[in-house]
């Protein structure tokens, strides 16, 4: 009888999967091995990224009975959530992102009297900062910018449209933008796209990325529309979104951070596979390996001492004893325990021991497998994240590096200096607030940095503003 055949996936060619006709028994066996491998070692991380040839495919969602088109983020529209998961699963990338966010935050967003280095003390400004927790909004903002290279802030105006009364950060992972029209997206949809419903989605008009303040003034009828030369009627909208994006090649609607290369090449997977491989190696070899010699009379002696005469029960008792010996030698909780057994002597004075246990490979040391490779992978991840390994602690692995204090100070100062461009982009919404509220002539915005000093200055650090 001819064996039933089936298709076995053997490779990929672009958008096509390659199959071969194989006996069903072979297909079942191979797929079982593939499933077990994926369970232990996971998929390639690059698989979460879409290779779609279309730059801005659109989907539609109905909100309050009105259809809204949006550009999905990734092939399944869940790419930012996948990025969160991938970063969170790796201790190097997690710590690098935390470090990047903290360094970019610096001393936080601060307001100064224009023309001086004195902190602003205006009651109205201080009340505005307090009621909107601008320090927290700014921290959330720079965190999103480090993860996704853009951030979105929602501003809410008073009913008469004369003041900004509320500022709220919108998580970038929840933001989906409208398709571009004349180079601009008209709105942003904010929702948890893992379980989005029309009732939980929020649509916000998106101000022009280049000139958000001018766009706001036009929408409120305060300035003429550059396209028509006339003033519009004041819009009924009182909430608007401001997008701050780090420039990237191609200016895609969702910026592609440079550090995404850790998934598009091999280093993220190399680090993960090394850790997974070491875990299973330790799990399968950590228990001591023993050779146990048991006298042929030992089993009968055990049964006789316990007065077991039934043949079936004797076999059960022998099986139980074998299991007890195995567990004693292999289980970690038995380390350091003693096992007491009896022995006899013959007339010649020779000892006859019932049980002998020998440790095999007792002098062999293990655990150093792939240590250098793990350090190399960790350094590669830090490089892609723009963080020197010494800035976040010693490189994970057995090979440690330790720069001098001067080197670490210069590395930290260099890292802080590179945040200037990020601060310029992140501060755009706050300049909009300042101009709209009429504070621009009295106050200025600065994001002071922490700069390490030398010991001869008798100070540990100093604050420098940009």
Say what each PLM segment does.
Residues 114, 147, 294, 359-362, ...:
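Generic structural "secondary-structure junction" signal
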Residues 2, 327, 413, 417-466:
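C-terminal anchoring/interaction modules
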Residues 63, 97, 102-123, 139, ...:
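Short glycine-rich, low-complexity/disordered patches
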Residues 2-81, 123, 127-335, 466:
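Structured, contiguous alpha/beta core segments that scaffold functional sites
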Residues 83-95, 99-100, 106, 112-115, ...:
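C-terminal structured domain segments
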Residues 68-69, 75-86, 306-316, 347-382, ...:
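Extended, non-catalytic structural segments that build the interaction scaffolds
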């Amino acid at each position: 009888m001819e064996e039933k055949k089936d298709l076995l996936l053997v490779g990929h060619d672009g958008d096509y999967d390659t199959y071969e006709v194989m006996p069903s028994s072979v297909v079942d066996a191979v797929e079982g091995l593939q499933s077990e491998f994926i369970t232990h070692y996971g998929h390639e991380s690059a698989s979460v990224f879409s290779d779609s040839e279309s730059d801005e495919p659109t989907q539609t969602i109905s909100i309050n009975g009105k259809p809204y088109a949006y550009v999905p983020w990734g092939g399944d529209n869940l790419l930012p959530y996948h990025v969160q998961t991938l970063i969170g699963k790796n201790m190097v990338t997690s710590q690098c992102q935390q470090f990047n966010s903290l360094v970019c935050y610096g001393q936080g967003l601060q307001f100064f009297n224009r023309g001086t280095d004195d902190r602003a003390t205006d009651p109205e400004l201080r009340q505005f900062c307090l009621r909107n927790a601008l320090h927290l909004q700014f921290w959330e903002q720079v965190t999103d910018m480090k993860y996704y290279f853009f951030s979105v802030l929602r501003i809410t105006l008073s009913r008469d449209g004369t003041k900004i009364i509320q500022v709220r950060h919108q998580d970038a992972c929840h933001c989906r933008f409208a398709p571009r029209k004349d180079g601009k997206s008209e709105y942003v949809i904010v929702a948890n796209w893992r379980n989005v419903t029309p009732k939980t989605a929020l649509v916000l008009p998106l101000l022009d990325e280049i000139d958000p303040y001018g766009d706001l003034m036009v929408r409120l009828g305060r300035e003429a529309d550059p396209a028509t030369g006339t003033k519009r009627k004041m819009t009924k909208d009182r909430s608007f979104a401001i997008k701050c994006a780090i420039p990237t090649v191609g200016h895609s609607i969702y910026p592609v951070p440079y550090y995404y290369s850790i998934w598009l090449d091999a280093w993220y997977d190399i680090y993960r596979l090394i850790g997974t491989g070491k875990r299973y190696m330790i799990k399968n070899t950590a228990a001591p390996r023993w050779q146990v010699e048991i006298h042929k009379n030992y089993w009968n002696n055990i049964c006789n001492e316990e007065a077991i005469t039934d043949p079936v029960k004797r076999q059960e008792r022998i099986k139980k004893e074998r299991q007890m010996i195995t567990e004693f030698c292999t289980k970690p909780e038995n380390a350091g325990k003693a096992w007491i057994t009896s022995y006899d002597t013959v007339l010649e004075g020779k000892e006859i021991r019932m049980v002998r246990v020998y440790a095999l490979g007792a002098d062999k040391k293990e655990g150093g497998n792939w240590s250098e490779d793990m350090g190399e992978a960790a350094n590669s991840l830090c490089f892609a994240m723009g963080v020197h390994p010494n800035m976040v602690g010693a490189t994970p692995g057995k090979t440690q590096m330790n720069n001098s204090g001067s080197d670490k100070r210069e590395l930290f100062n260099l890292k802080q200096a590179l945040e200037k461009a990020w601060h310029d982009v992140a501060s755009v919404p706050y300049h909009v607030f300042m101009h709209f509220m009429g504070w621009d002539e009295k106050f200025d915005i600065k994001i002071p940095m922490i700069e390490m000093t030398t010991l001869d200055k008798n100070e540990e650090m100093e604050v420098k503003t940009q």
